[in-house]
C-alpha cells in the first residue's frame, strides 16, 4: 500500500466535521448540518472516485489510532489501496476528550 498524501481541502473538511460533532453533540458519520461524509465532500468541491471516513473519540492520538487499527472496518479504510489522499480533523470538548475524523479519497 502506497503512503497516503495530505490533501489541504480534505483537511479543512475533516476539521469542520470534527468541530460540527462537538458543537452539535453527536457521534455519527451523518451530520445534521452536512449530511453524509460523501455529501459533505461534494458540498466543499472535493471530487473523488472512492471515499471513506473513520471517526474516533479518545483522549490521545495514540489511543485513537490503536482503536481504529484494532477495528476491522476502520483498519480496512486506513489500508485501502484505492485511497491515496487523507484529511484529518481533531476537535476538543467532546465526552471522549477529543474527536478524530479521518477522511479518505481516491482520485
Language model regions located:
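Intrinsically disordered, low-complexity
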Residues: 1-12, 95-96, 107
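Loop/turn elements at helix/coil->beta-strand transitions in domains of secreted/extracellular proteins
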Residues: 1-2, 46, 51, 83-86, ...
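Disulfide-stabilized extracellular recognition modules
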Residues: 56-107
Amino acid at each position: 500500500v502506497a503512503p497516503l498524501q495530505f490533501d489541504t481541502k480534505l483537511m479543512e473538511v475533516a476539521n469542520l466535521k470534527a468541530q460540527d460533532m462537538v458543537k452539535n453533540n453527536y457521534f455519527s458519520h451523518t451530520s445534521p448540518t452536512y449530511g453524509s461524509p460523501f455529501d459533505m465532500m461534494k458540498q466543499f468541491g472535493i471530487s473523488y472516485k472512492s471515499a471513506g471516513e473513520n471517526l474516533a473519540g479518545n483522549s490521545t492520538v495514540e489511543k485513537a489510532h490503536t482503536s481504529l487499527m484494532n477495528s476491522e472496518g476502520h483498519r480496512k479504510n486506513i489500508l485501502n489501496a484505492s485511497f491515496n489522499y487523507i484529511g484529518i480533523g481533531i476537535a476538543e470538548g467532546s465526552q471522549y476528550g477529543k474527536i478524530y475524523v479521518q477522511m479518505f479519497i481516491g482520485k
